[in-house]
Amino acid sequence: MADLEIFRKTVYGYMDVNCYILVNHDTNECVVFDPGAEAETLTEIFSTPTFVLKAIFLTHGHHDHIGAVNELKEHFGVPVYASKMEAEKVLGDPSVNLSSMFGNPISMHADEMLEDGQELDILGTKIKCILTPGHTAGGMCYYIEEMQSLIAGDTLFCESVGRTDFPTGSSSELIRSIRDKLYALPDDTKVFPGHMDTTTIGWEKKHNFACPEG
């Protein structure tokens, strides 16, 4: 079993976002989830021998989660992974990814378009892609079964859920995504959300006021 660890790096752009780094300590190779800001700081981290960046993963395409993507991709020459739906509907349109709202239009594309249920072999482990529409049309969570860990983006928070009043959002789809897909994971699954603190699936099933288990 690989020696894996998840680090949280909160980045400060237009709002605070939890950027996560999954590293294999046996090889020092890593991937980053949702590098939303602080491209210079992240570049410094990934220029060290203990964090060799291999890929960028996006849970969704909102501006606060993608702000450093283009700079990191250009500097390190690594691919960007996102759901096919998100790549087609959100990433390339500044009005939909909300970057134009904040006066800094961003457009980008995904090099690898992911499908629901797809499993990726990377860093000596498997990452399962779980499509969770609701916050955006192509929101995607990433489940690392070996670590009993879920990178949840803005789908599921500690005792809350993501907003659905932005373009392509849907409250009914979000609740369905959480109940049918995320709450089906083991209760001790650790949840690493895009904002706020970590939690577990079991805790959310009992205490999430916005999406009780049902």
Question: Which residue ranges define each predicted feature?
Answer:
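Short Pro/Gly-enriched beta-strand edge/turn motifs at strand-loop
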Residues: M1-I6, L98-F102, G124
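Short, glycine/acidic-enriched loop or turn micro-motifs at the edges of active sites
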Residues: D26-T27, A37, H63, G138, ...
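Active-site HxH/HxHxD metal-binding segment of metal-dependent hydrolases
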Residues: A37-D121, K206-A210
